[in-house]
């Protein structure tokens, strides 16, 4: 059921999946009821081609990017953030502090300022859109629970039975070149990444490798 006047807030990471989700949402609900919410990151570690990709997707959809940024985002990278609080993460199962500071806190602040909720009531006039697919049911269940507890509903276009697009190249946009060497569009030097990612950083990004060693 389509709710008239509902705003669909796409958590637009700059990665391929969230871009495809954004296309599906705009095609189904319209650009006027869609918000592309992004967290701009330090240009030292968010590849310039990811920024190119975000702009091209925004231009194609006719929806400007709305930014919810951490203060100092343009000069502080993931290493700076963790050094400031003298920790990487609180426990083995917790989210890395860089994600919390660079994305989660600005996201929650933006929501509270623009679309405040009153849990346990769930707002019925907005929906938060994520690019999780049908193979990520554990992530979907977790996100549904977290956001519902905060008073928000969520939707997952990549799980819809009827899809209009599967690859962003179908609309003439190339996905970020980072996908040719990594399997994601996270920061170069992602603190959640494994050995393979860091071996590539060591080989191709000596400045980032050097800063990581000193952090």
How should these model regions be labeled?
Residues 2-215:
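Nucleotide-activated chemistry modules centered on ATP-dependent adenylation/adenylyltransferase
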